[in-house]
UniProtKB/Swiss-Prot annotation:
Produces ATP from ADP in the presence of a proton gradient across the membrane. Keywords: ATP synthesis, Cell inner membrane, Cell membrane, CF(1), Hydrogen ion transport, Ion transport, Membrane, Transport. Disulfide bonds: none annotated. This is ATP synthase epsilon chain. GO terms for cellular component: plasma membrane; proton-transporting ATP synthase complex. It comes from Haemophilus ducreyi (strain 35000HP / ATCC 700724). Belongs to the ATPase epsilon chain family. The keyword ATP-binding does not apply. F-type ATPases have 2 components, CF(1) - the catalytic core - and CF(0) - the membrane proton channel. CF(1) has five subunits: alpha(3), beta(3), gamma(1), delta(1), epsilon(1). CF(0) has three main subunits: a, b and c. It is found in: Cell inner membrane.
Length: 139
């Protein structure tokens, strides 16, 4: 049995997940982070992307986060995000429409805020594609 630790994923609106996991993977601003039980304490910013965590039965779950912070303590890991959406709740058509709108607007102007929005939509789309490829394989 692999060592486990408590993982909390919290958005500005609600708690998305709270439970025991074997590992968690997030996109930090300095690169990808893999966290396992006993990891060194850490506080870092995370960028828009995927949080992937593995449960004891080796089931993987995916959550899109818009960025935020990761805090690693001896027995608990917390992901704080402005926006967090479970992978299976992402809507591909809405994501693609928002991505196209951001690309179109960005092509007409050079705006850092729009560039950030485009990066968030691309990150959402990646999470959606990963979740759906996993669901397709299970069928």
């Amino acid at each position: 049995m692999a060592s486990q630790f408590e993982l909390r994923i919290v958005s500005a609106e609600k708690q998305i997940f709270n439970g025991q996991v074997v590992s968690v993977r997030v996109s930090g601003v300095e690169g990808e982070l893999g966290i396992y039980a006993g990891h060194t304490p850490l506080l870092t910013a995370i960028k828009p992307g995927m949080v992937k965590y593995t449960l004891e039965d080796n089931k993987e779950e995916f959550i899109y986060v818009s960025g935020g912070f990761l805090e690693v303590q001896p027995t608990i890991v917390t992901v704080l995000a402005d926006i967090a959406i479970r992978g299976e709740e992402l809507d591909q058509q809405r994501i693609i429409a928002a991505k196209r709108k951001a690309e179109d607007t960005l092509s007409k102007t050079n705006n850092a805020e729009l560039s950030a929005k485009l990066a968030r939509e691309i990150a959402k789309l990646r999470v959606y594609e990963i979740v759906n490829s996993k669901l397709t394989k299970k069928r």
